[in-house]
Amino acid sequence: MPDLSIAYTPQGGKSREEITLRRLGIAHRSRWSHRGQPCWTSPRSHVNHKSLKQHPQHPLWLRMFEGRVPARRAPTRARTAFFGAGMTNNRNINGATSDLIDAFTETVGRFSARPAIVHHGHVLSYRQLGMLAGALAERLGAAPGVVAVPAVHTPETVVGLLGVLAAGGAYCPVDPAIPPQRRQAMLTAVGCRTGLATATGPDDRYGPDGPLLAGPLLDGWGLEPGLDGPALGLVGLPRLAGPDTADPVAEPPAGEPRRIDPEQPAYLLFTSGSTGQPKPVVTPRRAISVTVASLRELFGLTPDDRVLQFASLNWDTCFEEILPTLTAGATLVLDAEAHSGSFPRFLRMVERERITVLDLPTAFWNELVLHLTEERRTLPGSVRLVVIGGEAANPARLADWAALDTGRIRLLNTYGSTETTLITHAVDLHGPRAAERARPWAAGDRVPIGRALPHVLERIGEQDELLVGGPAVALGYHGLPEATGARFAVVDEVRWFRTGDRVSRAPDGVLTHRGRLDGELKVRGIRVDPAEVEAEIAGHPGVTAVAVTGATLAGRSVLVAYVVPRPGATAGTLDADVRAYLRGRVPGHLVPSRITVVPELVLTASGKVDRAGSHGRHAPHGPGSGRTPGAAPVPSVPAVPSVPSQH
């Protein structure tokens, strides 16, 4: 970003700078100059006015926070540590572009003939992708509100995401495989009235001359008649022009691009909630726009990169694969072999598709490293960057990784939360950019989560809790003001998200995770509140009390549940009954891997269910049992009736 000089707003002959805080994010009115040209910014500025809150690297932004964050957090130093002196933020797009769709549109113009998406050998160019997204935006109309999109690993989902954003709507991915009642509850919770249709099958998706992306709706999303909630107005995806195709997409008419308030919601995603209902997180456009700009630099993306789309499209990790790629002129690769469950097939696909960037859940990476070690193999030569995140990395696997022929590959550990928009902290653990270690990784080492990215403000609060601020903080939880107030706080006139994670800071500024302040867990890299699972299980008529906690089984983080049967319930089949009951109500990651029927739970001195104590008492012994080795016996305390959820 070019150097910018700060000028002050003249008020009655006096020069001054006006800075105010709005309810969400930072607003300001100031006058600054860019290469001698004066520019104005104000709380009502649109993206083409270069609103300061879209440019957290701007000197005025940093000036606003002088003295308001601890001295140990230095945004300018963090920037140099990641990118090196002299590197700019928007490498592949105009630095003046701030909105995500503006960045995508500019990328389409620069790389129109290059492949944007590759799916099972079929190629969708940037020009075609831009035309489809633009046509969908026209169908949706201006500001369509929350739009539900079936989240499946196909190009349609990407077109849906970009089209909804281009229309000024809020993208809401919904897994077609989750139970209909939960799906309906999610759509009702966010007031969704519009859904996208999807293609009927591979033959409809591709025609003789290339991709068509046809799409009449099949089955109304599988929503069951009689369920409470809004009826969806359904919008079909457009087709590309081609032989025998109806409704062809033409070149979009030239004109002034639609300007959208950066505080408008960009997407809604659901996180686990202690009440038994998921919490919809509302992320504004300014948050995803500034984050994607940082991630392009963090990953060092160029048009020559080929990025695998691996993550579930129901979770925000997929955005860090899709959006930086499609605003850098790189190629996004979707391939079913990525989810085949076979490491040999996965590796053959990576080699065949010439993948350069892998973004993997840490749990998957751990297993992949074991496979590579046992087979004495390494990743294909095309891979230059592996991004991991979602849970703590295993130091033993890091030692194995270092012993492989991986010195040329960046291994980037990342940290973030849905409420702070994708990645907020990162560190190179191995490879050409990693700091040299004094000794190899060993069991018991704590793996750091890294430094804050340039757009992120951080603060270590009471009990060493990590607070994250800056323009990437979400608006809050839709329709849940109390939950929003509990997790989003104003400290020293800055709005922060309370992560609930305890951290420590090393002398070099790198943070290390030290545990949770609450009972939240990570399962398959997804945040889970055990209380949500407990609330669901407590609804089973045969259960009188329940405790849910995390355990490690076969090297994987899983949920385990301990249930106390009601009098008269069939204890011998209760575990299977509860499992079937849950599968009809919640996503698969909320179904415990092991459900154990027990006569009683362990309680604390205050009478609350002790999850850890119950697990310590009732977990089976032996390797792979999930029981903590050497755990002291827990004294028996009779269970009290009807303990549906304690936290």
PLM features: what roles do these ranges have?
Residues 162-167, 189, 315, 326-328, ...:
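Short hydrophobic alpha-helices that are characteristic scaffold elements of the AMP-binding
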Residues 279-306, 316-356:
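Conserved AMP-binding/adenylation subdomain of ANL enzymes
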Residues 252-270, 277, 301-307, 313, ...:
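Conserved pre-ATP/AMP-binding loop-to-beta segment of ANL
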Residues 147, 164, 195, 265, ...:
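Conserved S/T- and glycine-rich ATP-binding loop of Class I adenylate-forming
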Residues 79-268, 283-284, 290, 398, ...:
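AMP-binding/adenylate-forming domain of the ANL superfamily
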Residues 200-213, 217-224, 232, 296-298, ...:
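Adenylate-forming
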Residues 151-156, 175, 301, 311-318, ...:
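Conserved AMP-binding
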Residues 125-126, 152, 191, 417-418, ...:
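Core catalytic subdomain of AMP-forming adenylate-forming
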